[in-house]
């Protein structure tokens, strides 16, 4: 179990797991230390019990030796008394004493047997204690080795944690640098986004102004178209009326010429008649006499004159009718003049509207001062209508090319939008990589700048187109002025009206074509404006997404800061834990040293106990020898007692007493070295016990 625990912290783990493993190792080491302390306390208690048992056995042995010596002294005393009073009447008392001695001997035998059994049990206990001591010693040595391994592992882990701490510090410094760079980049991106917002706002304002101008121009163009249509219709009506009037004028002129011819004929006839009258008056005066003769001729002439008067009356009536027709024609001419004046007024209103448009476009000019020179050059270059028509054709071609280029640009923008969508998906997939996000943001900013430049170029192109439309309107205005001049000239020269009408029709056809082209260009511009609105909305969405990404980056920055603070707190906690683990290791080392000292003391105690055991073995062998000696002595005493009984029976006390005294002397001589021999191991045991007590006190 301890080997598996010591190998487990070698695995690479995070700081929290390492801290938990350190806490678990500290807990296990404290538990092992407490268990070892408990084992040592149990072992010490067991040793104290063994020592107490040894002391009790020593005290019992001393008591037995004292009792044995007392019994021997009593036996010797009784023998002496028996020797002294062998023939006295106190033999009964001697027999009683012998019986008592025999009973005491039996008790001593039982005590010896009990002592032998206790000796065997003590031997077994000593063997068991030695085996347990050796096992505990091996277990403690193994535990000490395992603890040393754990200490080495803890040192290795501490070194690994120190290296990890250094690596974490380096990573923290690099992350802080990256955070600072990211913060700088975020600030740069924010400033760039603010600048782009300002540019976009300015572009929006310009776009709104252009939209307003375009809406105004479209309204004015619609009004002008409607007015042009009305003028065209009026011009067509006027052309028809002029044609009718010209026809009527031609017919009336022909009639007037006929009537003039008739009037001339009549005048000639009048002159002839007056001449005739003069001649006739002269003839009457000369031929007064021939009146009677010529009354018939006069009556006939009167009839002729009446007829002539009737004819003259008819002529006067015809003249009156002609005068009425002339007055009516004059009225019609006045009406045509009034209509032409109304047309002139309408043209003046159109001119005034055009002046207002010119003023509005002058305001647009003031906004686009950089292009005023080009406008003046183009205004100076586009004075003639034919050149303007050619220029308008060229401009139409240019507009077509521009539309084609804008369509290609729209396609490119659609491709860019698809690419942007794909990039957005890639951004969503790669949102975790801050550096890649920053690079993509930079690329997006560059593309946004390029697109802003493109939008600026498109706005410039739109301004150019507006200026071209202004030029076209100016050309229209010049055409209208020429038409006004032509109408004024029509009043002076009706014959040139047809030619001017043809030119006006050509101009109107060109203006119609231009209006159609302007309508198509307006529709294209509306489409472009819608596309640009969509693009602006896309850009706004992209800006919103960029803002959201920036907010996400800020939140990531805040989370990283919080994680940094947590890491710092973990580092501080790890440092505290390392300090505590170092303190615990020092305590463990001190405890291990104490355990080593206890083991040394235990080994010394074991050595002392082994010595004591050897001494006990020697004592046991001595006791066995003493028991053999006591058995021999008892055998000899039995033999002596039997002999004494036989001698008492034989009542040969004197000879037997002398013989017994002679036998007792060598016995006493034999007992004296035995006593010395018995006392010598007692003294050795006392010395060994005193040494054990000294070691224990130490």
Curated annotation (Swiss-Prot):
The disease this record links to the protein is: Spermatogenic failure 26: An autosomal recessive infertility disorder caused by spermatogenesis defects that result in acephalic spermatozoa.
Q: Where is the signal peptide?
A: none
List, as start-end ranges, the regions of compositional bias called Polar residues: 659-670
Give the region (Interaction with HIF1A) as residue ranges. Answer: 556-689
| Gene source species | Homo sapiens
Its function, per the record, reads: Plays a role in spermatogenesis. When overexpressed, prevents nuclear localization of HIF1A.
| Protein name per the record | Testis-specific gene 10 protein
Expressed, tissue-wise, as follows: Expressed in the testis, in spermatozoa (at protein level). Expressed in actively dividing fetal tissues, including sternum, intestine, limb, kidney and stomach.
**Where do the record's region annotations for Disordered lie?**
659-685
Question: Where mainly found?
Answer: cytoplasm
